[in-house]
Amino acid sequence: MADDQERDLQRFLENVDEITSLIQEMNSDDPFIQQKAVLDSEKKLLLMEREQEEDGCRTTLNKTMISPPQTPENADEMSPDAFLASVEKDAKERAKRRRENRVLADALKEKGNEAFVRGDYETAIFFYSEGLGKLKDMKVLYTNRAQAFIKLGDYQKALVDCDWALKCDENCTKAYFHMGKAHVALKNYSKAKECYQKIEEINPKLKAQVKEHLNQVTLREKADLQEKEAQESLDSGKNTAVTTKNLLETLSKPGQTPLFYAGGIEILTEMMADCTERTLFRTYGGFSTISDHEVIRRCLFLTGKDAVEEVLCVSVLKLWQEVCVDNEENQRLLVTHPDMARLLPSFMTSRILVIQQQSLDLLLQLTQTENGRNQVIKHLDMTQLCEALLSFLAFSDKKANTAIGILTDLALEERFQVWFQTNLPDVLPALTGALNREPKITSPSALCQCIALLGNISAEPTARKHMIAHEEFGNACLDLLVKCEEDMDLFREITYTLLGLIMNLCLEITFLSEMWVVKMSRKCLSLLNSKDGGILTRAAGVLSRTLSSSQTIVEEALTAGVVKKMIKFLRMGGQTASRYAIKILAICTNSCHAAREEVVRLDKKFDLLMLLLASEDEILAGNAALCLGNCMEVPSAAPSLLKTDIVRVLLKLAGSDSKETGVQLNAGIALGKLCTAEPRFAAQLRELHGIQVLNSTMKHLNDS
């Protein structure tokens, strides 16, 4: 009892010290210290309640008084119990108010968000501020308000709000993000980089986004230096710099003829010899002078252009190329101009060849860097752009290669891949049109590159399903394969690449129409007569994925001598070809006795299959076990293996910890068929304790 009283006393004294400290913090002038004290007091209250519940399990001192308590001599004095009760009551009231304020703050935040979306940033700031009046430690209100301040150009206030958000949560990545943007706007580039680097430290998963923002900071810093040097050249009276400025002023004059502007733009283009003039073009509003000029703009958007309007358009395209040379900030400004999203794709599909060529040259220049490619993907109409690039397959010259090369480079960017997965159904008609091109009048290398791009895209399951769902796409693949077979020497690369795409499509065999599968299988059976090793391998690859869907095709394949050809594949070696060959043999022997007999005849002592069973490639070994098990149904097959260690080999596979459960299952089935066909193998199995191994394997397979 005395020990319990002593512990209670010590606990009480500790509580008094802690509560006194909390009260002092609650009275602090710093609102964050106040809020922290409130939270700590709530935690303390919960802890005390938990301790009281635990204390209820042990004997406590009976505090019942015989006589009523005496009035304290000093009214200001408070008993310890009353003091704790007061703190408890205050904490509960504060917790209740905090919950109520949280609801109000959330409602005000939503109103602020709605105003922000409308572009009414002042109103958004008002609601965020009102919310902070209800709850001062709500970090999202600080970061949202900082974002609104950035939109209004009030970067210092944005930085202050970001600081407050970090006081609420030192790992608030959103605060560092907005702080970085504010520092960039204030030209504090080193501080901006520190902010973005801090984001990656906190969350390494954001590495890609951080890299992009750091790149933007570097480019902005480089652009500032260019502008400073360009202004110094202008101030020093450099002739070309002054001429550039004067020409821009002349071109901004309204009401002149298109030919006047075309001539001025051509002279201006000649001035764009180095970085100084290109930068001055930017700083003195060159992009808006050209793109927003009433006469020039009208000519750019006209569908049917006369000779003068054509000259003006070409001169503008050449100017844009020159001002973008080695100047990524100019490239950014050009690509982000609102008109460019639809203007550049429309130029590329123009009936005027010179405009087509110049616009293609411009796009090529814009996509030379990673940043340029991402700017194009982010800001241009990618559906129209893809269609425009694919339309260049109509040309047999280098324009087709350039266009598909650009598309391929864009497709390597993660941003493009994300866009493509979402928008593939919209682009599929154009991609199907590319496959429908007549290979004899299309650039073979460009068409091949286009098909390779489709093959890469089809490696992703969702993309494959979209392609298969678009029936015309599969038919276009089949038709193109037929066209290429007419001149295999000329179209060898196209055929080889196309078979790779078809192999990917056949991974979704259940979604393909039976008629298409039959036609494609027949075409690949004929390709097995090719002398080209690459085409042979891929044709076998397609068949390894289609044969199992149709007994008719299996029978046609046997008639075409597929077993003999696959045995030849296996004798030649090569992991990829062997994988396809043994799978085809497994499919054929699984459904056709004639195939089993032919395998037994061509591989009399099963030397090939034994070799594959010993392979470290689990897929090879598993299909070899399946094929061997099928062949055990041929009467003379099992005895031919008596002088081999086939039981030990199969038992090892059946008891292995293979990731491919089919390996264990196929080996177990093969053992069963082997022992059934030849009882002497059953004796070997018992000697090797194989029954226990098989039982254990079957139990494991059933459990998994």
From Swiss-Prot:
The entry's keywords: Cilium biogenesis/degradation, Cytoplasm, Phosphoprotein, Repeat, TPR repeat
SMART domains: TPR
Superkingdom assignment: Eukaryota
Coiled-coil residue spans: none
One GO CC term on file: plasma membrane
TPR repeats: 105-138, 139-172, 173-206
Modified residues (Phosphothreonine): 71
Compartment(s) of residence: Cytoplasm
Gene Ontology BP term (one): sperm axoneme assembly
Keyword Phosphoprotein in annotation: yes
InterPro entries hit by this protein: ARM-like (IPR011989), ARM-type_fold (IPR016024), TPR-like_helical_dom_sf (IPR011990), TPR_2 (IPR013105), TPR_rpt (IPR019734), TTC12 (IPR043195)
Known role: Cytoplasmic protein that plays a role in the proper assembly of dynein arm complexes in motile cilia in both respiratory cells and sperm flagella.
Protein name according to UniProt: Tetratricopeptide repeat protein 12
Gene name as annotated: Ttc12
